[in-house]
């Protein structure tokens, strides 16, 4: 469905608003997919995006559902949307206009699929169901509240290479980015590799920290409104974006607690910084291992603090203390 319209040839441009429902989905990137919608530069699209498990997790689910969860395919994403006039060598800009969360969501820890997957504490699964219907935040446990900063975990274009491509790894043209700063007010710029660009989005999170260390944010369905434009003959090397506000947004209200880890391997430093944060949350806030890892995943920001003081680099994990009421 579309609203608005175009005037006759030579008249002023009148942008349109289009709607894609939950049935306009696919599971792989593919430059040969027929577009679900074709739009002009300047148009807006309202996407009804499903959650990623294809209905396997419901509001009534318990941790037992993870024992039979089918991850093939991992994502169902909305689109693709073709932009008229888009060609390889151009850049597509996408303005994030609005994201409206669903009434509930979930986070889970799945064995073998998290930052600390080799730790014995995480050899068993864990599922957290969130009530997202109480305004702009959700209770994790009594005394711990997570503010919403919703964004699409997946936003990207069809790769130029032929065939089907997994939605799991991020790419030059975007994809499974999980960049929590891609919130309302942000404008993205992505290089185009295939005619029409073929944009798709999904995997919406109500909140997530930088790192998504348990493997999920607060996963949910959502209504996502995006505005598209085209930069002809201009090509960015990879995704770039401009934010309208502060990096920390609603998190920065009461200071931060931080753990650090050093060493010559940034991956190991990242794991250790989160291990130390999990230990602190267990000790200071009486959380279980799984609860602590989920809280880190939805609220803790990982940062590379320095990469010049060889042979050791520093990774910092920062947790906003405003979560604790």
Where are these regions (language model features)?
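Short, structured beta-strand/loop micro-motifs enriched in basic residues and often containing a Trp
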Residues: 20-30, 70-78, 165-173
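Intrinsically disordered, low-complexity linker/loop segments enriched in Gly/Pro
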Residues: 98-184, 189
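A generic structural signal for residues embedded in beta-strands
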Residues: 47, 91-94, 190
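Short, Lys/Arg- and Gly-enriched loop/turn segments at beta-strand edges
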Residues: 52-63, 99-109, 196-206, 305-308
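N-terminal, Lys/Arg-enriched amphipathic/low-complexity engagement segments
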Residues: 10, 15-69
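Conserved mixed alpha/beta catalytic, RNA-binding, or beta-rich assembly cores of soluble enzyme
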Residues: 152-176, 180-266, 278
């Amino acid at each position: 469905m579309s609203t608005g319209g175009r005037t006759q040839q030579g008249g002023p441009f009148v942008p349109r608003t289009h709607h894609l429902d939950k049935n306009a989905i696919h599971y792989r990137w593919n430059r040969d997919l027929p577009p679900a919608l074709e739009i002009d530069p300047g148009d807006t699209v309202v996407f009804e995006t499903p959650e990623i498990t294809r209905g396997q997790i419901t509001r009534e689910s318990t941790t037992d559902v993870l024992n039979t969860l089918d991850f093939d395919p991992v994502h169902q994403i909305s689109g693709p949307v073709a932009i008229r006039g888009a060609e390889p060598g151009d850049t597509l800009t996408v303005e994030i206009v609005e994201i409206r969360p669903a009434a509930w969501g979930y986070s889970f820890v799945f064995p073998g699929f998290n930052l600390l997957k080799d730790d014995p504490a995480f050899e068993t699964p864990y599922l957290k169901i969130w009530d997202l219907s109480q305004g702009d935040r959700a209770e994790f446990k009594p005394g711990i509240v997570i503010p919403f900063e919703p964004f699409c975990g997946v936003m990207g274009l069809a790769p130029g290479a032929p065939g089907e491509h997994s939605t799991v790894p991020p790419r030059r043209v975007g994809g499974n980015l999980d960049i929590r700063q891609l919130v309302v007010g942000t404008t993205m710029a992505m290089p185009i590799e295939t005619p029409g660009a073929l944009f798709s989005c999904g995997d919406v999170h109500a909140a997530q920290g930088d790192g998504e260390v348990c493997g999920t944010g607060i996963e949910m369905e959502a209504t996502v409104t995006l505005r598209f434009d085209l930069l002809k003959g201009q090509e960015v090397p990879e995704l770039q974006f401009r934010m309208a506000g502060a990096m920390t947004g609603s998190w920065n209200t009461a200071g931060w607690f931080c753990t650090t880890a050093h060493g010559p391997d940034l991956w190991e430093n990242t794991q250790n910084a989160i291990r130390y944060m999990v230990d602190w949350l267990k000790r200071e806030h009486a959380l279980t291992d799984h609860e602590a890892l989920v809280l880190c995943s939805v609220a803790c920001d990982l940062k590379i603090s320095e990469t010049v003081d060889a042979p050791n680099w520093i990774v910092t994990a920062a947790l906003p203390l405003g979560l604790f009421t």
